[in-house]
Amino acid sequence: MKQKDIPGRRSMNNKINRVMSFLILGLAFAAMIFETGNAVYTWSKQADKEQRYTIVIDPGHGGNDPGKIGINDVPEKDVNLAISLKLKDILEQNDCKVIMTRETDQGLYQDGDTNKKIADLHARCRIINDSGADAVISIHQNSFTSESSKGAQVFYQTTSEKGKVLAEILQEQLVSGLDPENNRVAKANSDYYMLKNTQAPMVIVECGFLSNTQEAELLTQEAYQRRVAWTVALGTLQYVSGGHN
């Protein structure tokens, strides 16, 4: 006998699919933490065809703007891009539409621009505001005069409630996935240009301190970059699939 379509069943099935996908990703991430090799991690998921989330990934700096220079002389822009590309791969495998502000070592400015930094920031904001994104993740690395400072931290626009939720979810994942002893919390900021001039829920993820010898070394290792990308992906998917966007 053909079963009647009960109202709400399709919606419930979609929610179940999203939860199952999130659980599968979590299990894959847990297995990845204990893996020391460079294997490529894959998982199966049942895509929700009625809902495809759009995520903008913004690798900070690039081109003639190196960002911070690590204690090991590694420029921040290279670490940002490496983590961002890994994050892109993971989110795309989870059926997200990913828009990158840059995919090479190139700034978003023209050679003739008088102020290339301002031109770059304007271009990034245009990409984000035209994207209709459910979430925006800007990847950066921190630095401080004291070499002892360490730990990932997420920043959000002070007046953005959705940005705050996204930041708190990501901060929790970064602490549990990278360093349980990290006591930093998600922090509001009212000064960052891109946070003030974008419409979608946006956060700036400072993945670690390039001024700290230990973290600077880790952040240049592909396996650790992948681990950072997984934690950020896990938090991002938790945010969008939870209906916060």
Where are the regions a protein language model picked out?
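Catalytic-site microenvironment of enzymes
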Residues: 1-245
